[in-house]
Each structure stands twice: as C-alpha cells, then as structure tokens.
Design a protein with these regions (language model features):
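Nucleic-acid-interacting cores, centered on viral/eukaryotic replication and modification enzymes
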Residues: 1-602
Length: 602
C-alpha cells in the first residue's frame, strides 16, 4: 500500500490490520520494478523512485566534483542519465511527466531527475547550461547534432513508452509468420488479450513479419478503450507533434504540418512501420532501435529549429559563432573518459565546455578589462575580453603556445598514421632544398633563418588512398587558426557562406588558401634563389607540381577540422581496419573501421 505515516511522510509498505484507512492512500503491486495499481499508489511509488535516483545522483556528484569534473560529466551522460529510463519506458507518460492533479505543486518524477542531472551539468560545464536558453537547448540535443548529450527524460518519455509498446505488443498474443506457422504469445493464457489487440493483427507476411498497416487499429479504437491504449495513442500523437514536418519544415515555418517521412509519418494504427516512398503507404517495418529512431526524428526537427534561431542572432554573438563552427571533431570531448592521454584538469574542462557552448571563458572573464602585452607595431597594450579573442589572437604571448599546439597535433597525427600501418615522413626538409643550384643563390638560401626555410617544408609526406583514388604520394600541410576577429569576427567574410546554411566556414576558407600559398612560395624561391624569370616554372615549382596535390589539414578554435582532416581519418581507418580488424575481434572490416574512425578523432 501507499500510506502516510504519523509524521505526514508518504511511504510504500505492506498492508496490516493496524493501519488506519485514513492513512492509506492507495493499493497496488510492483511487477519487475513497475508500480501497478491505484493512481495514488503509482504516484507515491514513482515519487520515491525519483527521490532515490536524485539522491544517488547528488551523492556521486558531491564525491567527484572536486576530483574530476571530466569523469563526473562522462558518468552523468552514460551512467546517471539512464538510471530512470527504465520507468519512462514502462510507466504511463502521464504518471512520469505530468504533475499529479491532487498535488499540483509537486514536480513530476521525470522533472525531479532532470533537475538533478541538470545540476550535475551545471557543476561540470557551468551555470550557463541552465540559465542560457540556447545553451540549454544544445545541452538537450545528442552529441551528433552538436549538442551536449544530456537528453531530457520528460521530453523523451512519450517516445520511450511508445517504442516499448511497439516492441512488446506483437509478442503478447498468438500470431502466424509468413509461412503460416503459429507463434505463441507471451500472454496467450490471459482472457481478453486477443480481443484487446485484435486477432490476427500481428500475423506476418513477406513484407511485414509482425503485422502490416492497421496492426494497432483494434488496440487504439473502440468505446471501451483501456488506459494503456489511451496512453499509447496520446504518446504517439505527441511524438508526431514534437516533430512537425520534415527537418526542413523549421526553415519554412510550417508549424502545423505533421511529419511526411519516417516512422512518425504514420498514424498510431501503423506505428512501427516506415513509408520510404513518402506517399503515406507503409513499405516496411523498422527492425530494432525503435526508441532511437523515434527520438532521432524528433531531435532532427529540434536541431533545425535551434539552427534557425541561432543563425538569426547577430553575427558577433559568440553563441552563434560557436554553433556554426562545430563538427565531428569538436564534440569528441563529450564522450572521452579521462586517462593518461586524455585527462583534463577542472579549469581546462571548464574552458572547453564554455568554448563549445559559446559561453564566456572562465579564465578570461576573471581577468576581463586587464591590459597585457604589446599592441600592434608597438601600440598600446591589449585589453582582455571575456571570450578570449584578444588573448588567443596574439602569437607573441610568452610560452610559445601556438607552436606547441601545432607540434602536438602534428606528432599525434604522425603517431596515428603509423599505428594504422602507414609510413609517414614528418617535416620533409630535403624535398626542395637540393633543387637550388650552387652559387650565390644557394649561399643566400643557407643564410636564411631556419624558420624562413621551413616555409617550404611540408608537415607530412605519405603514400595513401584518399577519397577512393588509387594510392598516391601526397604532401599534407597542417594549419591551425585561433580565436581571433580575423577568422571568427563579423568582418571575417563568412556571413555569405553561413547564410547559405554552411558551417565551419573559417577552416575551409583557410584550407582553400594552402595550395596557392605553396605555389607562391615555390615561385618566390625559384625567382630569388634559382634565377627563374617571372612567369616561368622553375625547379622548385616543377617539383611541387609533380605531386598529386597538397592536402590541407586545418584545425580551428572550436576543435573543428577541415574536410581534409576527415578524408585523412577515413583513409587511415580504412587502412587500419585491413591491419587490425582480426586483432580487434571485429566481425568484419567495416565494424572495425567504424571503431577506428572514433578512435582517430579522439
């Protein structure tokens, strides 16, 4: 029973004769952890479950917060968030999401757990993920949509429950497969089950193994519908309303259109079936991953709405800049466990999170307004801003941070190439220098500083298959762009491309300039040290043009990478899968390649 003790606290316990009827709130039982019974019994049980979940989350958070917010963040995403998912799948959404009518002030169970998870996110990322509406919306999206990976239990409860019904219901009553063989139902012996779902509703054929169009019609229609059918119908309808239109509908402001493709294009009687042709007629069932597919369709629409809203912000708004300059490499930090090679200190993690979500830098905010360094060409010292534009755009800051960053990325990439079984040369010094003839030109070349001569020293040279082409010899040049107004400011010239829906424009803009820079340097070297007349092709330029192409590898201030980096990662994963897939105990090469792509990005 659910009862109220002498102190007024609500509890779940065993009914005894000594219990007063005035103290008993409701009766019920627990089946596999799920409360079934009177509304008050279910309410009290779920409230206790949510409270216990919240307590566990707060305990773990308090123990880890001071030690490693990175570890706490990973636990929040992968361990704490799923704790309450079981009840969102198996309890009516109205009991999990909606506040109880009798106690309107009480938070719904899902909201209680969501609040606790959000407090952990505030501890790991910063209070901006709660206070800023755009950061909060990003936090609720999955990482693959440039979100924070912390889904709201209240927002996913309908999809979780509907997916559980779609998965379980066809197995509950007797049906036949496409060969006419009878399949026993899990609840065959319970009277009324066949009438509830409709005899033959889940009979299979060659196209639909567990029932075709209209398979849930008997379940959701009728004057005497049970609460389970009402809850399922409502959950499915709300999922459809949450994904109004296709993902592009957000740009057309088509707020009243229902989805026109995917699972949610179908009404409740066809739940679980997909219309591939887009004409409203189901063509196949979805086999497995039902909740994932439902959530993904809803989240695609929400991402489209968020993308539209963020693009409408002022070009100088840092939240807009951050959103438009994140891609697959930017979000790796969200899923990386701290270890010897990937551990971040608490201040470092706070900086990474703030940059990703477009919030002010904690370090720079603390020093905002202070003056440091020397201005351009001996001018006045620079002023620290809250986002770090000034600090990150100055290459002369003591410590050589720019060079260290470049070299660390270069060495890590070379190590990854070799780990994937590829031979790679790093900083190929002798590729062009031997082409300068003996004489005054060569003497002048030798008198140059090593930094100047390195202008024609490729970062990498290797033979590899890129983009489906045959194996060729490529020069690869690593470039890093930093947080500065020249690249990310409103005068950087990226607005036109961004208005067309493009993202990560600065790194691609920098990548496009690399090949021309190489040719220009080669021409200047020929004309200055080899005696080549302007307009003619000298030995250095001829050697450069003998290679297939120079592949630019550009990394940006938000961890974003250019297309060249993604091509290299794909090529290395392909080569590594050939070498390692058996040692990885993968079933096939493709499975190993997917794991290696994630590994190389990290």
């Amino acid at each position: 029973v659910a009862y109220r003790d002498r102190l007024g606290a609500e509890r779940i316990g065993i009914h005894t004769d000594a219990a007063s009827h005035r103290d008993i709130l409701g009766y019920g039982i627990v089946v596999a952890g799920v409360p079934i019974g009177d509304q008050e019994y279910v309410r009290v049980h779920l409230a206790k479950t949510a409270s216990a979940t919240k307590s566990k989350i707060e305990t773990i958070s308090s123990k880890l917060r001071a030690e490693s917010v990175q570890a706490l963040h990973v636990l929040n995403i992968f361990c704490l968030q799923p704790i309450f998912t079981y009840w969102t799948q198996h309890v009516y959404p109205s009991d999990v999401v909606e506040p109880n009518r009798r106690y309107p002030r009480a938070e719904a169970p899902a909201a209680v757990v969501d609040s606790a998870l959000l407090e952990v996110a505030c501890a790991t990322h910063g209070a901006f993920v709660r206070d800023d509406p755009f950061a909060n919306a990003r936090l609720r999206l999955p990482a693959k949509f440039n979100g924070g990976g912390l889904r709201s239990l209240a927002e996913t409860a309908e999809a979780a429950f509907a997916a559980a019904v779609i998965k379980i219901a066809p197995k509950l009553i007797e049906s036949t497969d496409d060969q006419g063989t009878k399949r026993r139902g899990f609840l065959d012996g319970i009277p009324g089950m066949a009438a509830l779902f409709g005899e033959g509703s889940f009979d299979g054929d060659a196209d639909f193994p567990w029932g075709g169009p209209g398979r849930f019609a008997a379940f959701i229609t009728g004057d005497d519908r049970l609460p389970c059918s009402v809850e399922f119908t409502n959950a499915w309808s709300r999922c459809r309303e949450a994904a109004v239109g296709d993902p592009g509908a957000a740009d057309r402001d088509d707020a009243n259109a229902l989805p026109r493709s995917g699972l949610l294009a179908q009404p409740a009687e066809n739940a679980g079936l997909i219309d591939d042709a887009g004409n409203g007629v189901p063509t196949r069932p979805l086999i497995g991953g039902m909740q994932h597919a439902l959530s993904e369709q809803i989240e695609k629409y929400r991402r489209g709405v968020l993308d539209r809203d963020l693009r409408e912000l002022a070009p100088s708004d840092f939240r807009r800049i951050a959103w438009l300059n994140c891609n697959a490499t930017s979000r790796v930090w969200l899923v990386v466990l701290p270890d010897r090679d990937n551990e971040l200190t608490n201040p470092e993690f706070a900086e990474v999170a703030a940059r990703y979500f477009g919030a002010p830098s904690p370090a720079c905010s603390a020093a905002r307004g202070e003056r440091f360094g020397r201005g351009h060409r001996g001018g006045d010292p620079r002023t620290v801003d809250e986002y770090g534009f000034t600090v990150n755009s100055v290459s002369s800051v003591p410590g050589g941070g720019w060079a260290c960053l470049h070299d660390q990325i270069k060495n890590e990439m070379a190590s990854s190439c070799r780990e994937m079984g590829q031979e790679v040369s790093v900083e190929v010094h002798n590729l062009f220098s031997h082409l300068i003839p003996q004489g005054p030109g060569r003497v002048a070349w030798r008198d140059l500083s090593s930094r100047t001569r390195w202008g024609l020293v490729p970062d990498f040279a290797m033979r590899i298959r890129l983009g489906g082409d045959p194996v060729k010899f490529y020069l690869l040049e690593l470039k890093c762009i930093h947080l500065s107004a020249a690249w990310y400011g409103q005068d950087a010239g990226c607005q036109r491309e961004e208005a067309r829906g493009k993202s990560c424009v600065p790194v691609e803009k920098r990548a496009k300039a690399v090949a021309a820079e190489y040719v220009k340097k080669a021409q200047e070297t020929d004309q200055t040290y080899c005696g080549t007349a302007p307009g003619e092709i000298g030995p250095v330029e001829a050697k450069l043009r003998s290679f297939e192409k120079s592949v630019p590898l550009v990394f940006g201030a938000f961890g974003e990478a250019s297309d060249g980096v993604e091509q290299l990662i794909d090529a290395l994963a392909e080569a590594g899968a050939d070498v390692h897939w058996r040692g990885m105990k993968a079933k096939k090469r493709e499975e190993a390649k997917g794991a290696l792509v994630a590994y190389l990005r990290r």
